[in-house]
Every structure is written in structure tokens, then in C-alpha cells.
Amino acid sequence: MKQAILSAIFGLCLTVGAWAQVPFGHTPPLHVDGNQLHDPQGNTVVLHGVMDTPSPYFNSWRWGNNANDAHVDACLQYFDKLYTAITDTTQGAFANVFRLHLDPCWTNDPDKKSDGKESGEADISRFSAQRLEKYLRSLYFPLARKAVGHGLYVVMRPPGVCPKTIQAGGEYQQYLMTVWDIVSRNDSVRKYAGQLSIELANEPVQVTDSTGQETPQALQQFFQPIVNKIRANGFTGIIWVPGSGWQSNYRGYATYPIRGYNIGYAVHDYPGWYGTSDSQTDAENGIRQFHEAVPVVDTHPVIITEVDWSPEKPGAGHYNEHGEWVPANYGTWATASTSKWGKTYKQLLDHYGNISMTLSGTGCYIDIDHYLSTGTVRPAFQ
């Protein structure tokens, strides 16, 4: 039963693939037309794939134990193998998008001490613009170019995660301005603007306006200047704009949208969000709650850049970002079954028809170690 249920996760991405008319292995430039992604022939395109990060720790030390020059080639070779696996249609893998985290393990200065204001990946005090420029040239863009060579569009996510509160005009906005200024000025990135897109931030929680208040205009005040900077630098590709509440709240954009062309919105979705779970499988209710929280789905393309699930099993669980208990599972952030929550999630995608997605890790799609040792692609968690 476990194998049958989890194989359905693998099959979900294949089913979503039927929406996109672009042949797999091809990446013609994409643009936004209304609330859809289109290719140059006017075909509607829906993307489906995975996210991952070039981190020794998060990659389970498979290519090395340090983020430094000596390990760049090994990291590139590792991801080239992953790209081969997730696009191997002969073995049933049909990914056509890769969300690339510009992991801070490369952009942080190892010789600089933290200021202690934030912890983990929300700590930007060790960020080095020089290191971002260096590893954009030697690692991040080569990773993106290899992905495109395998028929994958690429969504670039900035280094790290947002601290709990970010303010228009504040330090974190300036950090993102610096990151995307460097990236969008890069000649190679601009050259691939039809294949590479930008997700402005990862999981903002509380976003305040210039006065420090959570107002309907706060999201626009925070992200519009970053969009303007990217466009001023000549990057013409798609920009994915996040919401607040760990990317679950887009209500302010209904009144104060992001202005400009090639704009979409990047959303997160996990079991328990938008009124759906294994015990809440009313698809119509889930569609209504999603629309109430993400009204921009009517006017712009949406990409769910984090989503995962696997069934409950005995063992220790964890608390999620909302402080809610998540029972133990087979290796995902969220716990649910494909036959219950997954079916409801699929109905959401089918209803709107303009929602792309990336699973929250390559290891949520395929069994990485099995592929590396045998060359055989099989679904995760078997």
C-alpha cells in the first residue's frame, strides 16, 4: 500500500505535464499573457518539477563537505546527474522546471562573525556581495545553464530565508535589492531571461510598510522597488513575487498589485493549509479558501514553489512553521496521503489551470541514492 500511494506522488507530476504543450526537452522562452504562461507560439505552459539547493549538508554530503572552490566541479557534476534523472522520460520522469536556491553557504563570508540579530538562514550579517558575484559566475549560473540544457526552466531563489518581520525601506529589502541587482546585471542571466526566472524572496512572514505597519499596501511597497531595479538592469524574464504568511497571503495585491510585465506570484502549499488535509478533503472548500488567500490567481500565473507530502508512519513528528504538530512521515515536511489530501490538491490545480509547482526537494520526487548507485529512476520513499 505504501508503494502504491507514494508512486502516485511520482505520477502526479506526470499528469500535470499533460497541461504543457511544449515538448519535454525544449525550453523556448516563456512570457506572461494574462494569467497564463505562454511560449512564442502562444501555447499555454504549466511547469512542474522540484527545488533543490547546492549545499553539502542538504545534499547529504554526496559531493563534498565544504562550499568552496575545491568542490565546485563536484557540485556541478552531482546536479547534472539529478537533472538527467528528473527529466528521463524513458523512466517516467517528466520534470520541466527546477527551483534553484542560491544557497548562502557559498555567499556567506566564512571569516566574518555573525552580528547575532538573526539565526540560521535568516542571518544576512555574513553575506558577501563579492562572493555572490563570484559564485554566480562559477556555480549558480552554470547550474542554471546545465538545467536548461536538460530541458528545465529555472526559478532562482535568493540566498536564505526571510526573518520574521521585514519592512519596506528596511535592511532586508536592501539585502534583496543587492542580491537581485547583482544577479540581474549579469550578462549570462539576462541572455537566458526566457528560461530563467526570479523568485524575489523565500517565505516572508510579516511584511510591513515604511511606517512599520502591516497594511494592504505593505507587500507592494516592499517588492515593487526590487522589481523596478531588476527591470532597470535589463532583465526581461518572469519575476515571481511572494506573499506574506510563509507565502500564503496575497490579499493586499488584489488592491495594490505589482506593476509591470512578466509578473507572476510564488505561493507555498502544504497539507493543512487553505482548509485542506487528510481529514478535510472538500475540494470546493479548498478552492474557495485558496482563492480568498491568493486572489491574484485570477489575474496572473501562479507557481507553488514549495509543496510536499507523504503518509504518516510510526515515529517522532515535528512542529511546522505555524506551531502545528505534524505526525511522522517518510521524509517530507508535511504529512498526508495522495489518496486524500493529494487528490484535493490535484483538483485545485485542475480547477485553475494556471498553477505551476515545484516539490520541496528532488528527494520528494525520486530516490536519489538509488539513482546514483544504479542509474534507475524510481519514485521517492519506496
Please name every model-derived segment.
Residues 1-4:
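Positively charged n-region of N-terminal signal peptides that target proteins for export
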Residues 7-17:
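Bacterial N-terminal signal peptides
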Residues 20-51, 60:
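N-terminal module-boundary/linker segments of secreted carbohydrate-active enzymes
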Residues 29-30, 54, 58-75, 166-197, ...:
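Extracellular glycoside hydrolase catalytic/binding regions
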Residues 45, 93, 234:
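Structured loop/turn residues at beta-strand edges in well-structured enzyme cores
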Residues 67-97, 102, 106-197, 218-231:
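An active-site-proximal structural segment forming one wall of the substrate-binding cleft
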